[in-house]
């Protein structure tokens, strides 16, 4: 564990496929993906299945279906850091989607994953941390004076987060962000000219 005052640095290479690439990925999913990431509970909620079909009625590709569900959740379910207990005998996710209309990240992610799976699109939950708070260059941690690089963020336990990932053949797992209090993902439509090989 990290003690107060301690810091560590993480560097990562992020894959940010274009919308064009995701739309063109198709549906030739490997068996190891479909065996595990299309599973649904027995007697899964018919109202949630119907909602998934309604939301994605005009979506032509798995990417467009995932994006439509993401947008629906961001627009129709208000973020709340706490959720009361659902009425006895009620499916909690159904209650959140159709009555309570408030959720936090785990419920946003669960709703998107389960709706995608009802459509035959492999999806899974990822957990970790959101971006945290940006630090201004030259600003230190906990009052210390030290040089901080641009694009440095402070991440705390309240930044714990969950989000759905969707599988695209030839691309792999791609994150989506349905949680209403998080910034939407910025995914390029097509490769920029300066991204092409020289």
Predicted regions: what they are:
Residues 1-99:
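Acidic low-complexity segments
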Residues 97-107:
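Active-site loop and adjoining helix of the penicillin-binding protein/serine DD-peptidase-beta-lactamase fold
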Residues 71, 106-195:
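Hydrophobic/aromatic-rich core segments of domains that either
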């Amino acid at each position: 564990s990290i003690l107060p005052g301690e810091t560590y640095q993480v560097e990562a290479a992020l894959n940010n496929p274009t919308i064009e690439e995701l739309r063109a990925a198709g549906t030739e999913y490997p068996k190891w993906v479909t065996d595990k990431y299309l599973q649904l509970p027995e007697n899964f909620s018919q109202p949630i299945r119907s909602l998934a079909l309604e939301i994605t009625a005009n979506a032509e590709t798995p990417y467009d279906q995932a994006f439509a569900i993401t947008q629906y959740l961001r627009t129709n379910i208000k973020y709340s850091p706490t959720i009361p207990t659902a009425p006895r005998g009620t499916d909690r996710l159904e209650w959140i989607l159709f009555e309570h209309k408030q959720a936090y990240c785990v419920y946003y992610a669960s709703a998107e994953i389960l709706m995608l799976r009802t459509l035959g699109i492999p999806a899974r939950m990822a957990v970790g941390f959101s971006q945290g708070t940006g630090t201004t260059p030259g600003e230190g941690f906990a009052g210390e004076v030290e040089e901080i690089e641009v694009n440095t963020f402070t991440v705390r336990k309240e930044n714990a987060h969950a989000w759905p990932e969707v599988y695209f053949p030839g691309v792999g797992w791609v994150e989506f962000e349905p949680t209403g209090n998080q910034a939407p993902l910025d995914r390029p439509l097509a490769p920029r000219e300066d991204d092409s090989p020289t």
